[in-house]
Amino acid sequence: MTTHNAFKTILVTFFIVVGFYSCEKEFATVAASGIVDTTAVNFKSTYSKYIIRSKTLKLNPVQSNNLPIALIGNYNNPEFGSYNTEFVTQLRPSQFNPVFADTLENLTIDKVILSIPYFSNEIETLESGETIYELDSIIGNKENNSNYNSINISVFESNYFIRDYDPSANEPNVGQKYYTNKSNGNSNISDLELQKELLLEINDLYPNPSEIQIRDQENDSIIDRKSPRIYVEFDNLEYWRTKIIEKQGEQELANINNFNNYFRGLYFKVTSDSDQGFIATINTNQADIEIQYSVKSNVGSADESVTKKTYNLNLSGNKINFYNNALNIPDNDNNTMSISGTDGSIGVLELFSDEMIEHPFDDNLPDIS
């Protein structure tokens, strides 16, 4: 055992000595500024400098259907140009085959309310119970640094059928795509189809950060509070009675396919004369139309009573966002880039062109910032 261990010690020592000897010619002196020894030849290389070119390209229309949110409004940015955003959406009834009343003659519509929440954050709750909010996801011009300039919105019943599947696809069950330029990729969507009947005009709308307080009509007490939102009543109650209530027991309210073919959706069109407004990202999955109605029971008897009820049409169906943007695309020779979202613009840098700088060690490169 002693002889074997001694042999191992000699063998290990031999390899260590050989290792030091083989590395002797690879040593190089390292100074504070880097390797300076002429033996470190592997660290030398040549380089070239090229002109970097920049340009801005307008994006093609992008797919904009089946999203949980929507953009609405108009806005003019002095750097990027003007934006106008609108959308059309399907509706989803809160209940199919509804029974509004045993006798529709005893039913009266009280209110029909459009409710579309803004995105907002709770800041604090006061002792009075009022919640203070801060609005989120809104861009635009503020008047006197206080509030955004207002916009006008017209709400139409749409006669355009939004398909779930693409009939021109080579495979079954391929989803239909719709684009920001009012098209499905093959044909355009006409305003005539989108504007079947005007239902509501919302004038001088601006994003108010205050909570919505729902009050009792008899004693004016607060019975409900809602986060900041578009909250507007429809004037034409007879339209909703004919369109929805009187379809009780009919096939139009039997299932979602029948309903979408019957009531094809709502089109929200920005009708402001000025482009100095705002654009809001709205939470359409939480938006709805609420039909508030009263039903009389035991009419003409001593037990006659009135029951308050509601029926909701949610704006959570398939929707298409439309963008009509007039962007300021900068001159591609001015070494600037303009990058904008939606179907806006992208910046492109050409890093390795064929054109080399004549004096590769000249650091006076073009300023593209």
Where are the model-predicted features located?
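Secreted, disulfide-rich extracellular signaling modules
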Residues: 2-369
